[in-house]
Amino acid sequence: MKNGTTRSWCSILQMALVLVALAHLAYSSDKKPQAYRDINAIGHREIGYPTGVGNWYSLDKEKEIGTQASATFEKSTSLLRDPLTESYLDRLAQTIARNSDAQLPIMIRVIDSEDCYALTFAGGHLYITRGLLLRLQNKGELAASIARGVAHTALRSATGEATRTRLLGIAGFPVIGQDPPLPVNGTDSAFADKLVLLSYRRKDELAADYFGIQYLYKSGYAPECFGSFVQKAWPSSAKATFSPFPPLKTRLDALQKEINEILPKQSSAITDTEDFEAFRRHLLELPLPKPFPKQPVLIHSGSQKLD
C-alpha cells in the first residue's frame, strides 16, 4: 500500500512537472503581445523569460553565472586589448543598451581572431571577433551586431533555455538536439562552462532578430542595416556558435516584414559615419591576430551547487 501511494505521488509530481514544462514552452511561443510591437514601449516591458516558472535564475544569479562563463572563456581566448577599440565599441553598446529592454549591464569585448562571429553570454557579456568587425561595411551593421547581442541579454535566452532543459529533464523527457546538454545537477562553474557553448533555440534566435532590429531602430540607425549584417555574419556565426539558426531567407523575410509592419518611417536614419571609417582604419593598422584555440578550454573553478 505504501509503495502504491509513493508511486501515485511520483506520478502526480511528474505530471505537475510536465505541465510546468509545457507552460514554459508555451511562454516561448510565436504569439507576441501588442507591447512587443510598440517601439515606444521599449524599456518599459519585460520580454525575456521571467524569473519563476519560465526562468529559475534571478537576475543576480544570471549575472554571476555570466561572469564565471566569460572568465572561463577568456582564459583560453586571445582578446584584443586596445583602449581606442574598446572605448568605441563600449560607447555604441551603451547607446543601444539605453534603447533596449535589457535589465542587465552590457559589456563588450573583441576576440582577436580573423574569424567572423559574435557571441553572447548570460549576464550581458558580448564578444565580437576582429574579423567580423573588419567585414562590416558601415556603423549601422556594427550597431546591428551589438543590438542582436543586447536582445539576447534582454530575452534572457541562456538561463531561459537552461530552465527549459532542466524542466524537461526532471519531467523524464530526453531533450532532443541540445548540444551540449546542460546538467540537471552540477556546480555553478560547470553550468557556466556549459553556457559558453550554449546553442540558442531557433525561436530564441528569431526573437533576437525581432527585438534587435527594434533596438537598432530606436537607437537611430537604419533598420535595413540589420539584414545586411545578418547576411555577412550568417555563414560564420552558424558554425562558430554551434547554434541551430533558422534558414537565412526565413530570417530576412521576417526582418523585412517587421520593417514594413512595425517600424515607422524615419526622416533621418544613420547608416554610416566618419568615425566608423576612422575606427576601421585603426583596426587595420593593428598587429595581426595571434592564433588561439578554436573552442574554449573549459576550466572548472568552483563547487557551489546551483540554487
Residue ranges and their predicted role:
Residues 2-15:
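Bacterial N-terminal signal peptides that target proteins for export
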Residues 18-26:
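Hydrophobic h-region of N-terminal signal peptides that target proteins for export
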Residues 168-199:
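Post-HExxH zinc-binding segment in Zn-dependent metallohydrolases
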Residues 130-144:
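Short pre-active-site segment immediately N-terminal to the catalytic Zn-binding motif
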Residues 120-124:
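A short, glycine/Asx- and small/polar-enriched loop/turn
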Residues 11-14, 26-71, 78, 98-117, ...:
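C-terminal capping/extension segments of zinc metalloprotease domains
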Residues 84-100:
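Zn2+-dependent metallopeptidase catalytic core
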